[in-house]
Amino acid sequence: MKWEISKTFRFEAGHRVWKQNLTYGRGAQFTKEKPVNKCVNLHGHSYVLEVTVGSDTLSEQDMVMDFYHVKNALKGLIEEIDHSFIIDVNDPMYPELKDVAEKYGAMKIFPVEFCPTAEALAKFFYDFLKKRLEEAGLLGEVKVVKVVLWETATSKAEYKEE
């Protein structure tokens, strides 16, 4: 891409990485003591999402795309996910948390069909924005270059298609 622009969003959300087990899998060989699987607990983050779109050409306004339009392409999703609890519908806790949310209105549930790790959420936002560009007839002119999702100040995940 000759030109790229990035737009940053912030939102608060909870999640649970129900598949986390630090005793095996990639990287387990670096663990010397018995690890604590903290991310299986219900917890939250102040997420920072950065989306980058690009093009080999500029519009008649000399832009890849106006930042205003990038913001509006994601605005509805960001509003929906903000202050929600992101949970995999396959998580064993999902039925009970859904019942609690419905019974008491105490929790805004955002169900997904994947374990909501930072990596999986980055791909989720990438796919969502790509679909929005396609629906608008812009996908040939503008491409989603990458999505970066910061879960904490020191931990991020990045997704891009090759």
UniProtKB/Swiss-Prot annotation:
Positions that bind Zn(2+): H15, H43, H45
Biological process terms in GO annotation: queuosine biosynthetic process
Keyword Coiled coil listed: no
EC number: 4.1.2.50
Keywords (A to Z) from UniProt: Lyase, Metal-binding, Queuosine biosynthesis, Zinc
Pathway participation: Purine metabolism; 7-cyano-7-deazaguanine biosynthesis
Cofactor(s) the protein needs: Zn(2+)
First-level EC class: lyase
Catalytic activity: 7,8-dihydroneopterin 3'-triphosphate + H2O = 6-carboxy-5,6,7,8-tetrahydropterin + triphosphate + acetaldehyde + 2 H(+)
Gene3D superfamilies xref list: 6-pyruvoyl tetrahydropterin synthase/QueD
GO molecular function annotation: 6-carboxytetrahydropterin synthase activity; metal ion binding
Entry annotated with the keyword Lyase: yes
CC cofactor note: Binds 1 zinc ion per subunit.
Active site: C39, H83, E151
Miscellaneous information on this protein: The active site is at the interface between 2 subunits. The proton acceptor Cys is on one subunit, and the charge relay system is on the other subunit.
Family from the record: Belongs to the PTPS family. QueD subfamily.
Record function comment: Catalyzes the conversion of 7,8-dihydroneopterin triphosphate (H2NTP) to 6-carboxy-5,6,7,8-tetrahydropterin (CPH4) and acetaldehyde.
Descriptive protein name: 6-carboxy-5,6,7,8-tetrahydropterin synthase
Organism encoding this protein: Aquifex aeolicus (strain VF5)
Higher taxonomy: Bacteria, Pseudomonadati, Aquificota, Aquificia, Aquificales
